[in-house]
Swiss-Prot record:
Transmembrane segments: 36-56, 71-91
Family: Belongs to the chordopoxvirinae L2 family.
Protein name: Protein FPV129
Pfam families: Chordopox_L2 (PF05803)
Keywords from the UniProt entry: Early protein, Host cytoplasm, Membrane, Transmembrane, Transmembrane helix, Virion
Functional description taken from the UniProt entry: Early protein involved in early virion morphogenesis. Participates in the formation and elongation of crescent-shaped membrane precursors of immature virions in cytoplasmic factories.
Source organism per UniProt: Fowlpox virus (strain NVSL)
Amino acid sequence: MHTFLTARLQAIEDVSNRNLSMLELILTRAIVTHWIILDLVLNLIFDSLITSFVIIYSLYSFVARNNKVLLFLLMSYAIFRFIVMYLLYIVSESID
């Protein structure tokens, strides 16, 4: 009887350890996913600020000096950053 109870308790302990390992893995992945999303959101905000400043500066430069080449380069950069931000948004949504 004693060996049966010992074996049964050992089996219960093994199952509990597996469940705790699975729970730890799930929690770790959830925390990492949230940090990745937070990093993407902060990068999105920072890139949006930089892009808006680039657009404002390029418009100011166009009005002040009528420099069409600079405006073209800065607007091309802004469009490129918006495309990259959209692709990052798609990737972050596909992670969830």
